[in-house]
Swiss-Prot record:
Residues forming the catalytic site: 5, 41 (nucleophile)
Enzyme class: lyase
Record's keyword annotation contains Metal-binding: yes
InterPro entries attached to this UniProt entry: PLC-like_Pdiesterase_TIM-brl (IPR017946)
Keywords attached to this entry: Cytolysis, Dermonecrotic toxin, Disulfide bond, Hemolysis, Lipid degradation, Lipid metabolism, Lyase, Magnesium, Metal-binding, Secreted, Toxin
GO cellular component, one term: extracellular region
Its EC number(s): 4.6.1.-
Protein name: Dermonecrotic toxin LdSicTox-alphaIB3avi
Annotated function: Dermonecrotic toxins cleave the phosphodiester linkage between the phosphate and headgroup of certain phospholipids (sphingolipid and lysolipid substrates), forming an alcohol (often choline) and a cyclic phosphate. This toxin acts on sphingomyelin (SM). It may also act on ceramide phosphoethanolamine (CPE), lysophosphatidylcholine (LPC) and lysophosphatidylethanolamine (LPE), but not on lysophosphatidylserine (LPS), and lysophosphatidylglycerol (LPG). It acts by transphosphatidylation, releasing exclusively cyclic phosphate products as second products.
Subcellular localization, as worded in the UniProt entry: Secreted
GO BP annotation list: killing of cells of another organism; lipid catabolic process
Organism ancestry: Eukaryota, Metazoa, Ecdysozoa, Arthropoda, Chelicerata
Cofactor: Mg(2+)
Native species: Loxosceles deserta (Desert recluse spider)
Amino acid sequence: WIMGHMVNAIAQIDEFVNLGANSIETDVSFDKNANPEYTYHGIPCDCGRTCTKSEKFNVFLQGLQKATTPGDSKYQVKLVLVVFDLKSSSLYDNQASDAGKKLAKSLLQNYWKNGNNGGRAYIVLSIPNLTHYKLITGFKETPKTEGHPELMEKVGYDFSGNDDIDQVAKAYKKAGVTGHVWQSDGITNCLPRGLDRVKQAVANRDSSNGFINKVYYWTVGKRSTTRGALDAGVDGIMTNYPDVIADVLSESAYKSKFRIATYEDNPWETFKN
């Protein structure tokens, strides 16, 4: 999965997919009542990027729905996965469940169109704080109560705080999550970061009793870093430059080992090295 980083304006969806992304990451900010409000990152962000592009969250979802619905004039067949980077650190721990419910409601109405030919992309909810595990339980309740439990087949999870892998496992246990787990590791492209924790995550994925299904590394812009991440066995790379990642994947060392995921590839299925 080539994951376009910080895609917060509808116009950027086409821009990143046309550069080679088959997945995008979108920031979601919340208001003080735990309603998802804007697709917005804010300052500071990555080196070489504008940090302040945004849309109202529901408006962005409507644009995203068009981009991921076959037959729509804006349809992008390659776009198969969306990571919502939930900026939930602004919330109190006791608001996490509400935030999850409200987020699910918003997706149900504006993206899934209440189960009536909505967008088809797989969704990963990426949460920065382990203490906000109730965001997941709140989210999961909503499609059930609204009569569309099948939509949860399209939803996966990620804790993005670079926490100890054992602590991440405990948070999922509390949230009642078994499966659909992506594990991120990384740092802003302005700073270097080694691959030690990525390798730990890959080892968990590849072990017989691991809880991780997929591992992705962020935010990568250099060819050398891309090669290092691929050599470590990641499933996804988040980048500001999808064309760079696509270039490296076409090198002879990688093109026989990796291919770009399509809609037919199940993002919750573990593919071991």
